[in-house]
UniProtKB/Swiss-Prot annotation:
SUPFAM superfamilies recorded: Photosystem II reaction center protein M, PsbM (SSF161033)
Transmembrane segments: 7-27
Function: One of the components of the core complex of photosystem II (PSII). PSII is a light-driven water:plastoquinone oxidoreductase that uses light energy to abstract electrons from H(2)O, generating O(2) and a proton gradient subsequently used for ATP formation. It consists of a core antenna complex that captures photons, and an electron transfer chain that converts photonic excitation into a charge separation. This subunit is found at the monomer-monomer interface.
Annotated protein name in UniProt: Photosystem II reaction center protein M
Intracellular or extracellular location(s): Cellular thylakoid membrane
Taxonomic lineage from the root: Bacteria, Bacillati, Cyanobacteriota, Cyanophyceae, Synechococcales
Gene: psbM
Length: 50
């Protein structure tokens, strides 16, 4: 069943990639808030554009 396997892989990628991105974004913001756009959007005193 190649079609079922392809559908499983496609759904797994469709769910897994945004999940991994959100987990990485959450870890990067928790770790000293190194994420520039998240810090700039939440509190505007940190200006990465000097």
């Amino acid at each position: 069943m190649e079609t079922t396997n392809f559908g499983f892989v496609a759904s797994l990628l469709f769910v897994g990639v945004p999940t991994i991105f959100l987990i990485g974004l959450f870890i990067s913001t928790q770790d000293g808030e190194k994420s520039s756009f998240y810090s700039d959007s939440s509190k505007g005193r940190l200006g990465p554009k000097r």
